[in-house]
Curated annotation (Swiss-Prot):
Superkingdom classification of source: Bacteria
Cofactor(s) recorded in Swiss-Prot or TrEMBL: Zn(2+)
Protein name: Endoribonuclease YbeY
Task of the protein: Single strand-specific metallo-endoribonuclease involved in late-stage 70S ribosome quality control and in maturation of the 3' terminus of the 16S rRNA.
GO BP annotation list: rRNA processing
GO molecular function terms listed in the Swiss-Prot or TrEMBL record: metalloendopeptidase activity; RNA endonuclease activity; zinc ion binding
Enzyme type, top EC level: hydrolase
Cofactor note: Binds 1 zinc ion.
Gene Ontology CC annotation, any one: cytoplasm
Keywords attached to this entry: Cytoplasm, Endonuclease, Hydrolase, Metal-binding, Nuclease, Ribosome biogenesis, rRNA processing, Zinc
Membrane-spanning parts: none
Listed EC numbers: 3.1.-.-
Length: 153
């Protein structure tokens, strides 16, 4: 079982997602079984942020002086539920999710679901630096999204 802590440092998030912890828990509820870590107590933190703060994190930790949609900070390089109970942190930028500005709440939530899946896979050790890894990660993202797209949002 995965326990999520959600911290919001940007009040704009509450305009699109009223109960953010419930929202993210509902996403995890529909993940494929292999990602549920049944019988384990696994934790992760989500920081709902904005472009200003995610840009600072991106500069500090990746040496890229620009905002981005999501950052993942895995607790371990490759997560092993037998050795650790903390996956890591996912930071998501409101402005990236809210493009275009007239995006509907449903479309906003769908984007958040997709980017959460992406960040979650990074916490598990997936990466997309090499083309073959990119293809593998995209395939896995699509598989998870198909599991949950009609059930969440």
């Amino acid at each position: 079982m995965i326990k999520i802590d959600v911290v919001s440092e940007c009040t704009l998030w509450s305009k699109k997602i009223k109960r953010n912890k419930t929202f993210f828990n509902s996403i995890l509820k529909f993940f494929p079984k292999k990602y549920k870590f049944i019988g384990k107590k696994i934790n992760l933190t989500i920081l709902l942020s904005n472009n200003k703060n995610i840009k600072k994190l991106n500069k500090d930790f990746r040496n890229k002086n620009k905002p981005t949609d999501v950052l993942s900070f895995p607790f371990e390089k490759k997560f092993n539920p037998k050795k650790s109970n903390y996956l890591g942190d996912i930071v998501i930028s409101y402005e990236f999710m809210n493009k275009p500005k007239n995006i509907s709440i449903l479309e906003f939530k769908q984007k958040v679901v997709k980017i959460f899946i992406h960040g979650f896979l990074h916490l598990l050790g997936h990466d997309h630096i090499k083309l073959k890894d990119f293809k593998k990660m995209i395939k896995e993202e699509d598989l998870i999204y198909k599991f949950i797209k009609t059930k969440v949002a």
